[in-house]
Amino acid sequence: MSKLPRGLSGRQVRRALERAGFRLRRQKGSHMVLRRDEPFAQVVVPAHPSIDTGTRAAILDAAGMDPEQFRELL
């Protein structure tokens, strides 16, 4: 299992998820909701300058991705 870089911003996470087929559904305040239709997945990403590792792990889990897949999309 490879480590992900620390200090990823919400914008960087959003771009990586968009490369994986997610689209921005809506944004309200400091949170973005991204959705993929096939296979269905919906993820909430905080629009913060830095996302904690636990939050990032939860985002990857909800997206159905492993860290290596995500790293390739960065």
Each model region followed by its residue ranges:
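Basic nucleic-acid-binding interfaces
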Residues: 1-27, 31-74
